């Protein structure tokens, strides 16, 4: 009997408030006691953009080890910023959440050879049927992994290199574990050296007793792959330790460039990396230049896919974030509904691809009456509408794109506007409605 426990295709208690478009599918896999199968349960949540006719790829946002990380991973597929990337390229967004408590060995799942690669593929097969998009089962992947998620991604790279568009290793890889003999050393196939990848530890991890392995593991993985000519980069985060910080502001442009470069117009066979557009940089510096003019050793240099990512990289290694000079697009589908003497506003909006979504400003008759959230808080990075956790995921409760104006005069006529504010504070044009 299949271990897939099929959930409702629409997870109403989570999805209904978001008003961000798309649909959510969820499937749970029960733990197994069979040899070679996953001994932990896992929930996979998939988001599909509205109007997608052919799913070109799957962007996987994989959390790290421990109960807190697993809980953080529950909201990954609901992230409006990562959804904007997926929507641009006709991709699905997948957020796994393993059912691991703090007493259980993380390697039960973060080493995919212990069964998590099988459940991952089973979930994709299920989603392909449930969504009536058979191409999901064979679509290529972008793999983002934090800590144990990076461990998982680095081994998946050796198992399914032909399926992987690009990889982002945030503070994690399996290299140290296989070098120490703690796990079986994988055989790295030649195809693994053709995948664009970026290693991204926190600079404060380097001399940290607990997290130093995240630094050495990612840096040594970078050197191993770069020595073989792989398109690999290294970008330390100057502000952080093991938390993800504002790394998304470089990870998303990196994936954006790789998706544009490698996704085919049809089919699942990936296009090769275009090395003519590459920029290179000496590792642990803050200067990059076109590969054609680079004077250092290219086999030791940081590889960057194009000029835009190179400029973002140069900023990030100095500041831990990336700036944005373009305002977001306006919200849409603003609807006004009278409710018990008040006026309910609902709308939809996409996150700004460059810097995400910080807040909404509500205006009535040309005057600001509210902000959502009232005060955005950034505990681990820039303040965002959905919050930002240690794990680069939205924080619960997930906010609604909804406002109830209780101060309006009943029966009066008013014009309302909603303005989106992106992650750096730039405002969109107004979305307006009158009643």
Feature locations, PLM:
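A domain-start/cap signature at the N-terminus of enzymes
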Residues: 18-58, 89, 141-156, 160, ...
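Cap/lid segment of the alpha/beta-hydrolase catalytic domain
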Residues: 87, 93-118
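Alpha/beta-hydrolase active-site loop
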Residues: 108-135
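The feature captures the conserved acid-bearing segment of alpha/beta-hydrolase catalytic domains
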Residues: 165-249
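Alpha/beta-hydrolase-fold serine-hydrolase catalytic core, especially in secreted/extracellular enzymes
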Residues: 228-230, 237-334
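Pro/Thr/Ser/Gly-rich low-complexity, intrinsically disordered linker/stalk tracts
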Residues: 317-356, 410, 425-435
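Recognizes extended acidic, P/S/T-rich segments that occur
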Residues: 359-411
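Beta-strand-rich modules
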Residues: 405-426
């Amino acid at each position: 009997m299949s271990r897939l426990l099929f959930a409702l295709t629409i997870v109403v208690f989570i999805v209904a408030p978001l008003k961000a478009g798309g649909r959510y599918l969820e499937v749970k896999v029960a733990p197994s006691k069979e040899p070679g199968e996953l001994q932990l349960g896992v929930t996979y949540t998939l988001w599909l953009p509205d109007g997608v006719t052919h799913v070109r790829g799957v962007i996987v946002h994989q959390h790290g080890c421990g109960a807190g990380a697993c809980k953080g991973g529950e909201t990954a597929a609901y992230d409006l910023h990562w959804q904007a990337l997926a929507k641009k390229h006709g991709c699905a967004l997948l957020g796994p959440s393993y059912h691991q408590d703090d007493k259980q060995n993380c390697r039960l799942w973060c080493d995919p050879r212990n069964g998590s690669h099988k459940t991952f593929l089973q979930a994709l097969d299920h989603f392909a049927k449930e969504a009536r998009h058979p191409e999901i089962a064979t679509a290529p992947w972008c793999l983002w992994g934090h800590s144990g998620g990076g461990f998982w991604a680095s081994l998946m790279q050796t198992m399914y290199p032909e399926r992987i568009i690009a990889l982002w290793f945030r503070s994690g890889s399996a290299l140290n574990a296989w070098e120490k003999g703690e796990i079986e050393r994988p055989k790295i196939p030649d195809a693994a050296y053709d995948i664009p990848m970026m290693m991204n530890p926190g600079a404060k991890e380097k001399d940290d007793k607990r997290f130093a392995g995240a630094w050495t593991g990612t840096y040594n993985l970078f050197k191993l792959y770069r020595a073989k000519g792989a398109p690999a980069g290294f970008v330390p985060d100057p502000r952080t330790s093991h938390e993800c910080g504002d790394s998304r502001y470089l990870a998303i442009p990196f994936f954006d460039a790789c998706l544009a470069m490698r996704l085919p117009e049809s089919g699942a066979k990936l296009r090769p990396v275009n090395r003519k557009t590459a920029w290179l940089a000496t590792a642990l510096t803050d200067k990059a230049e076109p590969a054609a003019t680079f004077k250092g050793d290219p086999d030791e240099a940081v590889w960057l896919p194009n000029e835009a990512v190179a400029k973002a990289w140069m900023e990030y290694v100095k500041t831990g974030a990336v700036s944005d000079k373009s305002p977001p697009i306006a919200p849409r589908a603003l609807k006004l509904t009278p409710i018990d003497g008040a006026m309910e506003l609902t709308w939809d909006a996409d996150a700004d691809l460059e810097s995400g979504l910080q807040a909404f400003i509500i205006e009535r008759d040309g005057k600001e009456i509210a902000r959502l959230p009232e005060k955005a808080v950034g505990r681990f990075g820039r303040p965002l509408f959905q919050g930002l956790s240690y794990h680069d995921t939205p924080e619960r409760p997930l906010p609604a794109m909804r406002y109830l104006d209780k101060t309006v005069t009943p029966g009066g006529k008013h014009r309302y506007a909603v303005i989106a504010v992106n992650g750096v504070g730039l405002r969109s044009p107004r979305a307006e409605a009158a009643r």
